Amino acid sequence: MNKKLLCAVMFSTSLVSSMLCGCNSTSNDGKVEVELIQYKPEAVKAFEKIAENFNSTHSDIHLTIQSPNEAMTVLKTRFIREDYPDIIGIGGDINYSNFLDADMFMDISDFEVVNDIKPSYLNMDKELEFIPKDGVYAIPYVANCAGILYNKDMFAEHGWEAPTTWEEFNQLCQTIQSEGITPLYFGFKDTWTCLAPWNALAVGLAPSTVCSSVNAGETTFSVEYREVAEKMKSLLQYSESNPYAYSYNDACTAFARGESAMFPIGSYAVPQIQSVNPDINIDSFVFPANSDEKDNILNSGIDLQFSVMKECKNKEAVYEVLRYLYEDDTIQIYLDDQNAVPCKEGDFTLPSMLDGVKSYIEEDRMADFHDHHYPSEMSVDAMVQTFLMDDSSNAIDTFLSKFDANWIRYNRDLIKKVQDYIRGYNNEI
């Protein structure tokens, strides 16, 4: 295990006092013990049911699934102590990139379920590799989507249609405004909400490999993100008055109460909205960032995936656990509990609020959230909020220049590593 690399990705953590011993062993009753730690505590009920079902149907393996709060802190603390679980469940984001770069995961390309995963999601994991690697190191499980939620009953009452192009979207917003209704509610007081429309626009307007291309010295964000920034800024004309005064919870409440026709956010917001108004009829559409519908892409990212630790000693037992996790009926337990999107091909029941984007899911027209590649210390959400609040004539240029400068500042070592790899690769050709 590369401890030097692992320490590099560690942040300050508190030692966790009570931890189970990882890397499966045999219990007193002769069963192989398999430990899985996953990072979504909100899904604890689903995983309790999954573990119970598995253990009741397997006489030779005992599965323990932990769903702790602050799971990433728990995992990083355990890793530095070399106390590894067998399987971890994390998102497809920068944390996965860092763990993979630290050589922590087993190559599981021989696991048969890999062939059943939608190619878009497998590709997202490959794009998260800092340096290209042979093999498969995570199996995507479920995803979420982000675009625009809309009040389906309000649309029907007014005769509005979901737009499919940028021009249709602007015309719709103007029509809604003319009828005295707020088209969009943002809730930009919480800076992270600024990334919801940002990501949804970026997947349609910039390459999914933009961050890797910048690291390679092939382009800049000033070039690739200009149209994203321009269109993001233009959305403000359709928002609530002073969107920076209202939080995510405020936006969910306002949309639930019919104070806006649309809400640019991910499917993860639906339970919060329904807690205010259980009867609201919600659907969604892909953010129509382009003038041609064929160029639009659904913003969908891996919300949960499973990786096997390289130190795992009983691959056969772990694979049996994974086979059970990826059975259609098991996945459906999670989907029903969390309103998620399956990463596996199959005949699954999706929540109704995804009806408007279902064709994109079925056609595999999806790309990852760009912020999954952003280092957290760069605080891109706060940068976007500051940019949106800047009314100066050169706001876009200022923002893009800062994005380029900060990217270099916070990724200096990674950029050097990537460019050294490219030079070495080219010298070998």
Predicted regions and their residues:
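Mature extracytoplasmic/periplasmic domains
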Residues: 53, 104-107, 268-272, 304-378
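Extracytoplasmic "Venus flytrap"/periplasmic binding protein-like
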Residues: 53, 57-121, 153, 157-158, ...
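Extracytoplasmic/periplasmic substrate-recognition and gating elements
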Residues: 56-57, 62, 80, 134, ...
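A structural signal for short loop-to-beta-strand junctions that line the ligand-binding cleft
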Residues: 77-78, 85-86, 115-154, 182-186, ...
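Glycine-centered hinge/linker elements that transmit conformational signals in sensory
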Residues: 175, 215-244
